[in-house]
């Protein structure tokens, strides 16, 4: 276990040589002076007692005995008495008359009370998985006090690899959805409750009507006005609750995917009356809530259901899980238009419900190992949620090891979800002092510079962002040089402490990754320097076990391998380099400004579709490359992107033609694409190799679209995208 023991001056109440009447002495000169008494011997109280026992021992060397169902006495710690001074998960710490009592308002209140005592009185900070700091002292004395605390939100969750450490999870006062939702049914549950694999063929009428026909599939939605669905779903829910008698909440919520709601005449009528597709959903959930009045039902307000209905109101036991997925993150939600659109939805739901679960995003799905400086908005957004009747909060953030300051972000969110009035900057500095030690001033300066540069640039921060988006802003060359100088100093400051050095090197990975991503977009760079940077990045990731680079679990080792193959010069000469493009069917309008150059500029696109790629949606591509003169053609390859989460699928086929006059073309060959359901982001080459070389000046490329997204895809029934960048003629 990694531990860091920091010797620091103790506050007077811990260092006093004698015990004042109002104090409780737990340990004196390393010898236990008190015992821990369980008011009730249950799992929560015993865990709280063991937590206190452990850290008192590690701080002082003295181990307090634990007594079940013992009597109150002088100099004892009583854990688990009930209190009505706090709400669920809340606690009271009362030190008076020679007794220290940690009282609970229910659930894990006793554990959280012990955590508060250890933090505020013993100086223990549990900062990440298996990592904590404490203040050694042979004497532990608790002053007179009476403190009552309740959480701002009754449910608090965030992603973090540290959550695998149960002590950390309790310390951050975090919960897991499986603790509350029956059968782990907490989001996107439609296909689990009414499986399209079971009912799709025999009852397509149960599923969304989109673009002229029913579209059953595991990402399709339900036809919520169909009278037969309700009883099937109600029966299924009844069986789930009976199998999980200790849980009384379930999610009945739309499958993932946008605009896939039913548009049959009956559903359309309800949607038009309610002013939102959410109308059908709330009506359906209300019926379930009436059928099971002692249960609680959660449903999503997400993408097409984000805005509330005009007329129907959720019943009290219907929970609205409201998601702000489409908002930008460079400023608080109140300060940009995407945020204000979400705020209108939040305020609308708050007018008709006091039972709101906010799902907030602080993640870059496409590049989790990239800078994402959103720390300055965390507090304001959480306060906003609280003001608008949110009682439950999930913060979806970059939580895997190696992602951008994952440990700091999880720590700050845990603290702010419990108490949004805490000072965010103080939290950041406290964490950094404990987790980065002597390197903390440099990393704090880095975060301040990065945030300032982001705001000064005016560039939005997006959940599908790329470092390349910011290469002229917060990641410009001069700033990257300054950031690296700070990290150099940070590494020097902790060079003798292997644990701290590991923390600093992991924190530097997003900067290293950004430099690699930016380097591949700039021609004429130093190949040897880039190779060295790539080796360093891969080595550090392997050394510390960094598992992935994006939401789709693309591995670091694959990234490094593909980078060498794809982005570093390999001697291949493209005879179509710089060719003029003649469009028969041009790309979507937003991609036309880059299209003339992007297909033959020698710069390959990365895993994020927003840079270098050229896209078509729901239609074919047809264009001609004018190479300027007759050239020998042996092989043609076009590069395609595969990214299912963005509706980017491989097309049906690509055909290549050759011509001498741009009028009469002869077919050279066709590449057919197999169906690919792999969720990984990848690059797919479409190559045709000729049996014998031909002479040609013009190369025509015709790509046949897949058409509509298939039944298994998020965009079922809607036009699919395909993206390509380089066309290479050899």
Q: Where in the sequence are the language-model features?
A:
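Catalytic domains of carbohydrate-active enzymes that cleave complex glycans
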Residues: 416-597
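Aromatic, loop-rich ligand-recognition surfaces of beta-strand-rich domains
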Residues: 605-669, 684-730
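Bacterial Sec-dependent N-terminal signal peptides
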Residues: 1-25
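Substrate-binding cleft/loops of secretory-pathway carbohydrate-active enzymes
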Residues: 298, 302-326, 369-374, 402-410
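Short, well-ordered secondary-structure micro-motifs within conserved domains or adaptor modules
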Residues: 65-87
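Feature activates predominantly on carbohydrate-active enzymes
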Residues: 32-33, 43, 48-51, 55, ...
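Structured mid-domain segments that build the active-site/substrate or prosthetic-cofactor binding neighborhood
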Residues: 228-229, 340-439, 445
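Acidic, His- and aromatic-enriched active-site or binding-groove loops in soluble protein domains
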Residues: 270-288, 316-335, 415-422
């Amino acid at each position: 276990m990694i531990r860091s023991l920091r010797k620091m001056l103790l506050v007077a109440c811990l260092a006093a040589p004698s015990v004042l009447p109002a104090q409780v002495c737990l340990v004196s000169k390393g010898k236990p002076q008190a015992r821990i008494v369980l008011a009730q011997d249950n799992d929560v109280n015993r865990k709280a007692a063991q937590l206190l026992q452990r850290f008192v021992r590690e701080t002082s060397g003295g181990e307090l005995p634990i007594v079940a169902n013992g009597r109150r006495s002088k100099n004892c710690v009583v854990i688990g008495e009930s209190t009505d001074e706090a709400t669920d998960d809340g606690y009271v710490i009362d030190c008076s008359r020679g007794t220290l009592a940690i009282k609970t308002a229910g659930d894990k209140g006793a554990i959280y009370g012990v955590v508060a005592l250890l933090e505020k009185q013993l100086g223990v900070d549990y900062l990440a998985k298996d990592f904590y700091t404490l203040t050694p002292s042979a004497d532990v004395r608790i002053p007179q006090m009476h403190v009552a605390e309740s959480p701002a939100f009754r449910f608090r969750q965030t992603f973090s690899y540290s959550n695998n450490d149960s002590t950390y999870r309790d310390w951050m006062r975090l919960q897991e959805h499986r603790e509350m939702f029956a059968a782990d049914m907490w989001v996107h549950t439609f296909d689990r409750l009414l499986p399209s694999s079971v009912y799709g063929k025999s009852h397509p009428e149960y599923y969304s009507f989109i673009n002229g026909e029913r579209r059953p599939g595991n990402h399709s939605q339900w036809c919520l006005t169909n009278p037969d669905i309700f009883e099937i779903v109600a029966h299924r829910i009844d069986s789930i609750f009976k199998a999980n008698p200790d849980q009384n909440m379930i999610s009945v919520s739309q499958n993932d995917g946008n605009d896939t709601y039913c548009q049959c005449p009956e559903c359309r009528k309800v949607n038009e009356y309610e002013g939102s597709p959410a109308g059908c959903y709330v009506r359906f959930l209300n019926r379930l809530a009436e059928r099971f009045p002692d249960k609680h039902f959660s449903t999503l307000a997400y993408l097409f259901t984000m805005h509330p209905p005009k007329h129907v109101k959720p019943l009290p036991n219907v929970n609205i899980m409201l998601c702000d997925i489409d908002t930008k993150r460079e400023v608080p939600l109140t300060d940009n238009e995407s945020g204000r659109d979400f705020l209108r939805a939040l305020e609308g739901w708050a007018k008709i419900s006091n039972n709101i679960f906010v799902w907030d995003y602080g993640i870059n799905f496409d590049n989790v190992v990239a800078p994402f400086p959103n720390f300055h908005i965390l507090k304001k957004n959480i306060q906003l949620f609280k003001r608008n009747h949110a009682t439950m909060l999930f913060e979806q953030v970059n939580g895997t090891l190696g992602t951008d300051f994952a440990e700091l972000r999880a720590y700050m969110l845990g603290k702010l979800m419990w108490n949004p009035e805490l000072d965010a900057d103080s939290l950041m500095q406290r964490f950094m002092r404990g987790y980065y030690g002597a390197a903390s001033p440099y990393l704090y300066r880095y975060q301040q510079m990065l945030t300032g540069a982001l705001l000064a640039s005016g560039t939005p921060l997006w959940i599908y962002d790329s470092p390349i988006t910011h290469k002229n802003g917060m990641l410009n060359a001069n700033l990257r040089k300054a950031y690296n100088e700070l990290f150099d100093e940070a590494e020097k400051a902790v060079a003798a402490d292997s644990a701290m050095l590991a923390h600093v090197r992991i924190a530097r990975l997003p900067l290293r990754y950004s430099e690699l991503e930016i380097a591949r977009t700039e021609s004429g760079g130093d190949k040897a320097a880039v190779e060295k940077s790539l080796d360093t990045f891969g080595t550090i990731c392997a050394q510390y076990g960094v598992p992935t680079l994006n939401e789709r679990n693309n591995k670091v080792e694959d990234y490094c391998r593909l980078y060498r193959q794809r982005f570093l010069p390999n001697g291949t000469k493209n005879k179509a380099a710089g060719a003029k493009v003649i469009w028969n069917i041009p790309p979507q309008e937003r991609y036309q400004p880059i299209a003339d150059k992007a297909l033959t500029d020698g710069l390959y696109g990365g895993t994020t579709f927003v840079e270098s790629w050229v896209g078509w949606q729901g239609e074919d591509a047809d264009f001609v490359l004018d190479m300027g003169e007759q050239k020998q053609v042996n092989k043609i390859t076009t590069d395609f992107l595969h990214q299912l989460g963005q509706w980017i699928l491989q097309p049906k086929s690509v055909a290549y033609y050759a011509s001498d006059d741009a009028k009469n073309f002869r077919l050279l060959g066709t590449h057919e694409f197999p169906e690919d359901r792999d969720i990984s982001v990848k690059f797919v080459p479409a190559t045709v190799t000729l049996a014998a070389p031909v002479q040609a000046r013009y190369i025509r490329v015709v790509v046949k679209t897949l058409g509509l997204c298939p039944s298994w895809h998020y965009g079922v029934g809607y036009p699919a995208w395909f993206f390509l960048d380089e066309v290479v003629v050899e």
